[in-house]
Amino acid sequence: MGNSAAREDFEWVYTDQPHADRRKEILAKYPEIKSLMKPDHNLIWIVSLMVLTQLVAFYLVKDLDWKWLLFWTYVVGSCISHSMTLAIHEISHNSAFGNSKAMWNRCFGMFANLPLGLPYSVSFKRYHMDHHRYLGGDGVDVDIPTDFEGWFFCTPLRKLVWIILQPLFYTIRPLCINPKPITRLEIINLVVQFSFDALIYYTLGGKALFYMLVGSILGLGLHPISGHFIAEHYMFLKGHETYSYYGPLNYLTFNVGYHNEHHDFPSVPGKNLPLVRKIAAEYYDPLPKYSSWVKVLYDFVMDDTLSPYSRMKRKLKGDLKLE
């Protein structure tokens, strides 16, 4: 189905990522942005309500007919699950309790992780910090696809399969690109998560567990919100490494669409990123942007010039400070 993508390698660049320099320039001109670098304590209540909502949903779906279970799993469960992964993204930046209470944030991330079904929050934090420090870094940034992904998923049909299988690739990619020794916190995350899964299964049954696990997988695969995976850093326009999205799904995703703003100011919680854009509008308005994640997914699949190889990549030099 369709032609193969034209790219046969990543877009190798020999310059540093643009975010550090732009951050310095904006802060020199607008030092008031520093006042936005503070915890968002509303995250605590929002995430707690999301966990409670999923617990109620587990109970409500436990006796549903399978066709209705599948319907509600995709329509409701997948949306909440994907939204929760982006809440965990916020928590990984210590946005819930602040940098002075890092362990509180790690524990809260494990709590937010519970309705996802698979241990995720602690490992995500470790790799995500590398992504910010070394964006596009060869052998470090696991957000960059492997060479196999770029080589194999090169036709529209294969790219569609690749999007559906995003949860799988985000799971195995770190093991191929930048494996890290497992930590005590990751073991705790795993034990807590699987204990919770067992509790759900024994108290509410297999359908509740299905809703939890399959909802997470579907939400991170072929789903409108999953457009952000492609929109954030895939090079739709040559020379542009990061892109923002300013559409309505930001309300469900803690403003993850404000991605240029986020990489420029990772200490600013999602709720304040629109203020960053407003204050420094002359820096962000000229940058390429999206208004539809669904269109991003469609264009990525159908455009023969785009593939998993459509990422800017750089060799890293000097001593690396890895998580």
UniProtKB/Swiss-Prot annotation:
Protein name listed in UniProt: Sphingolipid delta(4)-desaturase DES1
TM regions (residue ranges): 41-61, 68-88, 104-124, 152-172, 185-205, 210-230
Membrane topology: Multi-pass membrane protein
Superkingdom of the organism of origin: Eukaryota
Subunit structure: Interacts with RLBP1; the interaction increases synthesis of chromophore-precursors by DEGS1.
UniProt short sequence motif Histidine box-2, positions renumbered to this chain: 128-132
Gene Ontology cellular component list: endoplasmic reticulum membrane
SMART domains, A to Z: Lipid_DES (SM01269)
UniProt record, GO biological process: fatty acid biosynthetic process; myelin maintenance; sphingolipid biosynthetic process
Chain span(s) of sequence motif Histidine box-3: 259-263
Enzyme Commission number: 1.14.19.17, 5.2.1.-
GO molecular function annotation: cis-trans isomerase activity; retinol isomerase activity; sphingolipid delta-4 desaturase activity
